A protein has these predicted regions:
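Short beta-strand/loop motif that positions the catalytic acidic residue
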Residues: 227, 232-235, 239
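Primarily recognizes the serine-hydrolase "nucleophile elbow" in alpha/beta-hydrolase
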Residues: 109-190
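Catalytic histidine-centered segment of alpha/beta-hydrolase-like enzymes
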Residues: 269-278
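Mobile cap/lid helix-loop segments that gate and shape the active-site cleft of serine hydrolases
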Residues: 30, 146-163, 186-223
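Short beta-strand element of the alpha/beta-hydrolase
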Residues: 48-58
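N-terminal cap/lid segment of alpha/beta-hydrolase-fold proteins
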Residues: 17-47
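Alpha/beta-hydrolase active-site loop
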Residues: 95-116
């Protein structure tokens, strides 16, 4: 199953009012589809808006689902007064990890570099995503300030040098993780790795059990410290794609460092359906507004 596919069907196309938008902006100064983003501003009459970055779920298989992600989750964020930046990233078929987190960080740097051009208030940049997008959003949050990281004999460039805006910060200020896979060493029955045909195998380019150091580098929990932004984690207890225990593991690790704002388990929530609902969308928007020091709606 492709992470995020079902939720795309469930919350297919929302109705939007008058909004300002720019689409298919390349944030890496190249020609790759996976390096494009769309910017949407609410119809609020302000000169600039605080920002939430949005990342689609696809089991890391897709490089062009930014519009789907916006259709699925954009409206509550716009209604909450945020500019929404929905981004593509390279797929696991295009490039192996850490290319995907390099892309996310490049997009955030681009946002800061071009804030005036697109009426963005970068005093606050939140980030959210569902499924594999939840994983990348979480990883962006826990790797604020991390350039290169080594586990065992494996060293990876987490920040990367994608694009022309490398002098700008890739920091994010708050994270909402929607049912993201977190610990790939415990994806199978909450206890062990999945096999060579799993999405994470495609992402890292090998059988997970044979690349435990890479799985540790892939895991947002590896990097958690007291300086990380606050997190809201949302997961349905009937999710058969990404086990609910993944978010329990993450919740416990975030709590230990004081970085968890709230953990929401949605009863009977699946991988999108039921988990995506008016109440959880409101929780997301209120969380971001609180972290951005905006009045609650």
């Amino acid at each position: 199953l492709v992470f995020g596919f079902v939720c795309a069907l469930f919350y297919s196309f929302m109705s939007f009012g008058q909004i300002t938008q720019w689409t298919d902006i390349n944030y890496a100064n190249d020609s790759l589809e996976g390096h494009k983003l769309d910017i949407y501003l609410p119809d609020g009459g302000q000169t600039e808006y605080k920002v939430v970055v949005l990342i689609y779920g696809s089991a890391w298989f897709a490089n062009n689902m930014k519009q789907m992600a916006f259709q699925a989750m954009g409206k509550p964020l716009l209604d909450g007064g945020f500019a929404v930046v929905s981004i593509n990233h390279r797929s696991s078929g295009d490039a192996k990890f850490p290319a995907q987190i390099n892309d996310v960080k490049a997009a955030v740097r681009f946002i800061r570099a071009h804030a005036d051009e697109y009426r963005l208030d970068t005093s606050f940049i939140g980030i959210t995503g569902f499924s594999s997008g939840g994983h990348l959003s979480s990883l962006a949050g826990t790797t604020n300030g991390v350039k290169v990281y080594k586990v065992g004999d494996t060293e990876m460039d987490i920040e990367g040098n994608v694009g022309d805006c490398t002098s700008f910060s890739s920091r994010v200020d708050a994270v909402v993780d929607w049912f993201g896979p977190i610990d790939m060493t415990r994806m199978e029955n909450c206890a062990t790795t999945k096999g060579a045909d799993s999405p994470e195998a495609a992402l890292i380019g090998g059988t997970p059990a044979e690349h435990m150091d890479v799985l540790t580098l892939l895991n947002p929990m590896t990097y958690i410290d007291e300086k990380d932004p606050k997190f809201l984690v949302i997961h349905g207890d009937a999710d058969t794609v990404v086990p609910h225990c993944q978010s329990v593991f993450f919740k416990d690790a975030l709590s230990a460092k004081g970085r968890l704002e709230e953990f929401i388990t949605v009863p009977q929530g699946q991988h999108g359906p039921i988990t995506f609902n008016e109440q959880t969308f409101k929780k997301m928007t209120e969380f971001f507004r609180k972290q951005a020091a905006m009045d609650l709606c």
